[in-house]
């Protein structure tokens, strides 16, 4: 990999980074109690768009952009779905922020059907103000991760209190967040949660060395644990689903990659038919059970010498990247069904640990890998 740019984002640890699915925006969460948003433009040297602060009293441990409401091509005259960011903090609270779309008073607006394009340009060029939409309370201890589902209607949060909360909202208004489920499967601190990119399937990673998979019960709207993935011999710090659009994805299989204190990165899989929640299409013998069969598919080639904190799966290239306490970033590629290490970058943040990774796209549509470390830097890699 080649380092494109190092962004001095914070003066304290960076715990989390998240890239917007459509706009060239990157958000960070830091021990300095703030989140910064940057424009992913190499030609402009990755300028800061805004800093979100004065909301949390302790470290911001997790940030995640909400997926756009409609991920299809829209009419040019329709309004942009405003970028929306969720944060989780060690102060046990969540917050949700949204960019206020600038009003365009150009006289030629009616003659130029480029409303969305104009709004996008202003949002990423620091013309938009960011508004605090909600502060969400419920957890008893530090929030370790937040995640939006693919529809932007559910937010999952996990905590040191060993619980996972699922919050429901109207993605159009974000007026209120109602807790619809509290999941208590884990026996220890829950480190991470992530939704499947196209299904309401949730994965959680924990200090108890396991990964739990959740979905709604077949007979009602309650959420329940559908599978417990055992195999790691240490804390599971992070997991990521493979996107169905990934070049390596199978039409019949759903896969998940996980990273752990045991120095390993593992891939797990289940049948796609068993993961989908179309109850009417299932045989009556299966409808009565919410259980799923997940198997460990493989352990990726060894690349790390200390705990692995972050793992991400590219929907564009199908590559997996991992990073952690040893300061290394490893990139893996699957060829003819076999996973190989494509490259390892050592001392990617000098002597500092790496806490977070994200696959992102620049404003010129190039895919890059973004890393955040204890040094307060966001590094952009190609």
From Swiss-Prot:
Record's keyword annotation contains rRNA-binding: no
GO biological process, one term: tRNA wobble uridine modification
Compartments, as annotated in UniProt: Cytoplasm; Nucleus
Pfam families: WD40 (PF00400)
GO cellular component terms given for this protein: cytosolic [4Fe-4S] assembly targeting complex; nucleus
Entries under Gene3D superfamilies matching the protein: YVTN repeat-like/Quinoprotein amine dehydrogenase (2.130.10.10)
WD repeats: 9-48, 55-107, 138-178, 185-224, 231-278, 303-342, 349-382
SUPFAM superfamilies: WD40 repeat-like
Domain of life: Eukaryota
Record keywords, A-Z: Cytoplasm, Nucleus, Repeat, WD repeat
PROSITE patterns per UniProt: WD_REPEATS_1, WD_REPEATS_2, WD_REPEATS_REGION
Predominant cellular place of this UniProt entry's protein: cytoplasm
Keyword Repeat part of the UniProt annotation: yes
Function: Essential component of the cytosolic iron-sulfur (Fe/S) protein assembly machinery. Required for the maturation of extramitochondrial Fe/S proteins.
Annotated family: Belongs to the WD repeat CIA1 family.
Assembly and interaction partners: Interacts with NAR1.
Protein name, UniProt field: Probable cytosolic iron-sulfur protein assembly protein 1
Source organism: Meyerozyma guilliermondii (strain ATCC 6260 / CBS 566 / DSM 6381 / JCM 1539 / NBRC 10279 / NRRL Y-324) (Yeast)
Gene, per the UniProt record: CIA1
């Amino acid at each position: 990999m080649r380092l494109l740019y190092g962004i001095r984002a914070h003066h304290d640890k960076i715990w989390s980074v998240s890239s917007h699915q459509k706009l060239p925006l990157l958000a960070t969460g830091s021990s300095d109690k703030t989140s910064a948003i940057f424009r992913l433009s190499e030609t402009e040297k990755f300028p800061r768009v805004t800093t979100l602060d004065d909301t949390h009293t302790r470290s911001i441990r997790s940030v995640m952009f909400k997926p756009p409401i409609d991920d299809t091509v829209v009419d040019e005259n329709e309004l942009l779905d405003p970028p929306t960011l969720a944060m989780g903090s060690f102060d046990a609270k969540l917050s949700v922020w949204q960019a206020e779309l600038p009003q365009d008073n150009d006289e030629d607006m009616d003659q130029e059907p480029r409303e969305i394009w104009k709004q996008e340009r202003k949002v990423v060029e620091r013309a938009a103000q960011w508004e605090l939409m909600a502060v969400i309370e419920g957890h008893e201890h530090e929030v370790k991760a937040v995640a939006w589902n693919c529809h932007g209607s559910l937010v999952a949060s996990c905590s040191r209190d060993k619980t996972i909360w699922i919050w429901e909202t109207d993605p159009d208004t974000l007026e209120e967040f109602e807790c619809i489920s509290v999941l208590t499967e884990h026996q220890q601190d829950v480190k991470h949660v992530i939704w499947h990119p196209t299904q309401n399937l949730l994965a959680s990673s924990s200090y108890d060395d396991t990964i739990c998979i959740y979905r709604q019960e077949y007979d009602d709207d309650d959420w329940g644990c559908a599978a417990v993935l055992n195999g790691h011999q240490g804390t599971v710090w992070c997991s990521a689903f493979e996107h169905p659009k990934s070049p390596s994805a199978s039409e019949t299989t759903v896969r998940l990659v996980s990273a752990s204190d045991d120095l390993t990165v593992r891939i797990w899989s289940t049948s796609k038919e068993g993961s989908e929640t179309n109850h009417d299409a299932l045989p009556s013998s299966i409808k009565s059970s919410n259980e799923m069969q997940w198997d460990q598919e493989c352990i990726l080639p060894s690349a790390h010498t200390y705990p692995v904190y972050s793992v991400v799966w590219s929907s564009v290239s199908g590559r997996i990247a991992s990073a952690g306490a040893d300061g290394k970033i490893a990139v893996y590629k699957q060829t003819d069904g076999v996973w190989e290490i494509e490259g390892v970058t050592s001392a990617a943040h000098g002597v500092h640990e790496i806490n977070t990774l994200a696959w992102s796209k620049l404003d010129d549509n190039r895919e890059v890998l973004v890393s955040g470390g204890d040094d307060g830097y966001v590094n952009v890699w190609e």
